[in-house]
Amino acid sequence: MKTELNRLDDVSRRQFMLKTAKTALGVTLLPIGAGRLRAEGTGPGTPGFGKAKHVIYLFMEGGMTHIDTWDPKTGSTKGAKDPIKAKGDSIGSLGGYMENMAKVSDKIALIRSMTSKTGVHESGRYIMRTGYEPRGTIVHPSMGAWASHFQGRIQGVTLPDSVVINSGNAGPGAGFFPPSMSPIPISNPEVGLQNINPTTGEPMFQKRISLMDEFDSSFRKKFESDEVSAYTEFYDETMKLMKSEDLKAFDLSQEPADVREKYGRDRFGQGCLLARRLIEHGVRFAEVQMGGWDMHNYVDEAMNTRGTTMDSVFATLISDLESKGLLESTLVVMGSEFGRTPDINMNSGRDHYPVA
């Protein structure tokens, strides 16, 4: 499959996000170039198709420099560090800051031909999280919401179908789908899911719920609609979640101290650890955001902190998933709004570069 990825023609970021979403939904991977794949005997049921049951989407907010990470160059554009040899034969080399990922690069595939039409952060984020360009009157669903729409909730799982970690309440959410398909926002992985415990004793809590249901019942009978039903379903699912043993998946304190240290104590590291715990408990789609990639100034200094952190955490996540037998069923995707210019600017940084 890595060979096929390397052979495919240029694709846009929007096309890539649609293919990624389809993969998460159990639809055939990479329909672009499908004729070529069929000619070589690859299809559903053969290696490379249909294994993913979960997605961890690592979004690098700000426009990650591709040259210093996944698509290194030589000469004056390479930056402060020389490219390093990647493990295996399909990738070649990685940016000099990617020492840990180079050791596990035989487990990843790179698409180095993506392009975009926008160099604006907001539009780029929207495309990379929905697969659509922004339109004034429409809010499109996030990829996690699409997964819920097409696949439904995973049977027997009380946890939300999708979560977004380190984002607060920002993001497209359910879009034009019902509220029940909205990803649950986790602003701080150390804190986990907030406001989930009743503020009163159980008897008083149940009395309030019964009273609320009594008030709502006449409204539901008078205004029968999908929107009202979706709101009721959302409330019911929340009640189940509040009583579920699966809530412990949000509690990072249950992880061994050495595992938490290995991921790193920053929010991206702990966010990736939380994502692993959540998919382990049945969550289908977990997005983890990491900001700080808008490196217009002193890109080399910024990469010495941001880049090395991302490298260490990403490699730890891959190894951890593999050790727990989750890597085969989990698609881990990294994306960003756009790349950054090959030329270093007057402030020793790199500017927006949507053609990569």
For the regions a language model picked out, list residue spans one by one.
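Ligand-binding pockets and gating/stacking loops
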Residues: K2-A356
